[in-house]
Regions:
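Conserved NAD+-utilizing ADP-ribose enzyme module
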Residues: 1-109
């Protein structure tokens, strides 16, 4: 768990936000759940699949304390098997980093 940030982020469609906040994050068709180092990284990754994705913040310290493993897989990408709902909170839509991303997306549309 060396050099793993205390918080990581996961993008979801706004329609699926509550499902993930209540049921956690699972890999679906992938082997791993892919987490991002920053809100901006997660927003950019999510924007490929979702219009203005919501971002979930994951408490990695608590997750690791509960016995979950997180791997560093790339410059800004981290992997884990699953994320329990207790470690997930929504990044508010008025978060500064998130609103900057919305501004960039607005210019592209």
């Amino acid at each position: 768990s060396d050099n793993i940030p205390e918080l990581l982020y996961y993008p979801v469609s706004r329609d699926e936000l509550e499902i993930h906040l209540e049921g956690g994050i699972h890999p679906g068709g992938r082997k791993w759940v892919h987490l991002s180092k920053t809100i901006t990284n997660a927003a950019n990754a999510g924007a490929v699949h979702h219009f203005h994705p919501a971002i979930i913040e994951i408490d990695i310290i608590q997750m690791q304390a509960a016995g979950n493993t997180v791997f560093h897989a790339g410059t800004t990408v981290y992997l884990t098997e699953t994320v329990d709902a207790q470690f997930c909170v929504q990044v508010p839509y008025d978060n500064t980093e998130y609103t900057l991303m919305l501004g960039e997306w607005g210019e592209e549309e």
